[in-house]
């Protein structure tokens, strides 16, 4: 017998679907329900690596953590990583499949439906409940024939489906009622209820709004979820960086992260932003560097295009003259070197470009993609021999022109160098994503910048905080009411 599926779809992108799925996963898990997240297809350059070296969306790995599970590739069988110029790398079952333009992918998309259903069925066989997430809106009519993520999944699984709307951006009635109107009748029947997300103020003032939605939709409003600030969970994609909520006024230390084109895995820097007295500021203009005590060049899906963009924006001289510490992660590490070569046009345009010249390294792109979890030791003078854990996702091979490795990767029978540093450790870079999630290393680097460790405060589990917040706003025993005895004990 296959386990039931609870589906979460939204009126648009960025309405809070991923966060709601995380909340529902933790609510179910702490009741003893063996629950797994699922998203047929995700488009994001924020990726995670499973224990088997497979690449999935970072948001799915977060949902797996909420469900108290180790992430697996079945939870996200298809990942689309935009590279710019209408091209994307398609990851299928955790491995690179093809790099395609959008129209080519649409034409081949239906070939992947069997992979989607096989992955979903495997989860339904292994767990008591699967909570599936849609993508964007389920009623993008010009794209719906090619949609393998939203109501096609719900229909296949006959899933009880929640429709989520973001009231904070306005237009909740048009968004909710319009979405329901545009669904096919058989799809509309699967909608079990509506969730109004990100409500600011007193929810009691929305009583009339609930009545309007219920009367016009013939669907119950199952919850009004208030805005929850500073959640402490990674954002799904770079849309979040456009929100004007970067508060640095009260920070003793501001770290600038250059918002490169096709920025990738920017959740690497969330642990920095969560430290008291530290602000992470995403910057687009060279003059913003004057407000920063340290600078980070993040990962990017298109290193050569990012290098050209830095020159066009006037960053070259500003970076060269920056007096504070400089760090490069993955693509940002490549940018700090002497030369970047792409003879096989792995990134699409090919060619060679000079790097920023701050580290003695050269990089050449290859079609083989390195994806793995790693354990390492730091060689940096202010964090000597600190143990680290993280993961790598890259297609370039970088050679050191001087014997100055920043880290030593520890493997079963050997070690090898990763990253590079200047002798004093002021400028360094590496391929290790998640490096700042290592508390001892993170705080050592911040201390080098003049930051002082704050008094120890027992951290609150963000998943528990989220689950408490959402559960208090939903219909009591929502999962049981929706799924009843279908959830296996």
UniProtKB/Swiss-Prot annotation:
GO terms for molecular function: ABC-type vitamin B12 transporter activity; catalytic activity. GO terms for biological process: cobalamin biosynthetic process. Signal peptide: none annotated. InterPro entries: Class_I_gatase-like, CobQ/CobB/MinD/ParA_Nub-bd_dom, CobQ_GATase1, CobQ_N, CobQ_synth, GATase_3, P-loop_NTPase. The keyword Calcium does not apply. Pathway: Cofactor biosynthesis; adenosylcobalamin biosynthesis. Catalyzes amidations at positions B, D, E, and G on adenosylcobyrinic A,C-diamide. NH(2) groups are provided by glutamine, and one molecule of ATP is hydrogenolyzed for each amidation. NCBIfam families: cobQ, PRK00784.1. Belongs to the CobB/CobQ family. CobQ subfamily. This is Cobyric acid synthase. It comes from Herpetosiphon aurantiacus (strain ATCC 23779 / DSM 785 / 114-95). The gene is cobQ.
């Amino acid at each position: 017998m296959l386990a039931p599926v609870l589906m979460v779809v939204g009126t648009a992108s960025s309405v809070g679907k991923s966060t709601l799925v995380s909340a529902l996963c933790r609510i179910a898990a702490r009741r003893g329900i063996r629950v797994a997240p699922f998203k047929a297809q995700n488009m994001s350059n924020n990726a995670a690596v499973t224990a088997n070296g497979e690449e999935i969306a970072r948001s799915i790995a977060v949902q797996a953590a909420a469900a108290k599970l180790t992430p697996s590739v079945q939870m996200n069988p298809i990942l689309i990583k935009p590279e710019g110029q209408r091209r994307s790398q398609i990851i299928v079952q955790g491995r690179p499949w093809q790099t395609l333009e959008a129209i080519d992918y649409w034409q081949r998309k239906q070939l992947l439906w069997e992979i989607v259903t096989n992955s979903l069925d495997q989860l339904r066989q292994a767990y008591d409940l699967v909570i599936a997430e849609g993508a964007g809106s389920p009623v993008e009519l010009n794209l719906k024939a090619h949609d393998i993520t939203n109501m096609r999944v719900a229909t296949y699984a006959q899933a009880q489906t929640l429709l989520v709307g973001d009231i904070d951006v306005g237009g909740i009635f048009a968004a909710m009622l319009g979405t329901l109107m545009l669904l096919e009748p058989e799809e509309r029947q699967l909608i079990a209820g509506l969730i109004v997300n990100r409500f600011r103020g007193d929810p009691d003032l929305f009583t009339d709004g609930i009545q309007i939605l219920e009367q016009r939709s013939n669907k119950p409003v199952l919850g009004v979820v208030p805005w929850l600030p500073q959640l402490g969970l990674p954002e799904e994609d770079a849309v979040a960086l456009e929100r004007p909520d970067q508060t640095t006024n009260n920070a003793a230390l501001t770290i600038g992260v250059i918002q490169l084109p096709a920025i990738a895995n920017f959740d690497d820097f969330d642990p920095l932003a969560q430290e008291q007295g530290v602000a992470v500021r995403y910057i687009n203009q060279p003059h913003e560097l004057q407000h920063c005590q340290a600078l980070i060049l993040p990962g990017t899906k298109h290193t050569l295009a990012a290098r050209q963009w830095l020159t066009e924006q006037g960053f070259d001289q500003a970076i060269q003259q920056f007096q504070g510490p400089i760090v490069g992660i993955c693509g940002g590490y490549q940018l700090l070197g002497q030369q970047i070569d792409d003879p096989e046009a792995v990134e699409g345009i090919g060619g060679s470009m000079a790097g920023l010249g701050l580290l003695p390294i050269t990089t050449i792109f290859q079609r083989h993609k390195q994806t793995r979890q790693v354990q390492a030791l730091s060689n940096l003078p202010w964090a000597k021999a600190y143990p680290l854990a993280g993961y790598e996702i890259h297609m370039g091979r970088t050679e050191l022109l001087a014997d100055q490795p920043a880290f030593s990767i520890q493997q079963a029978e050997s070690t090898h160098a990763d990253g590079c540093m200047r002798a004093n450790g002021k400028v360094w870079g590496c391929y290790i994503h998640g490096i700042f999630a290592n508390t001892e290393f993170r705080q050592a680097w911040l201390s080098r910048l003049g930051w002082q460790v704050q008094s120890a405060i027992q951290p609150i589990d963000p998943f528990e905080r989220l689950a408490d917040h959402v559960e208090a706003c939903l219909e009591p025993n929502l999962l049981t009411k929706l799924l009843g005895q279908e959830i296996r004990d």
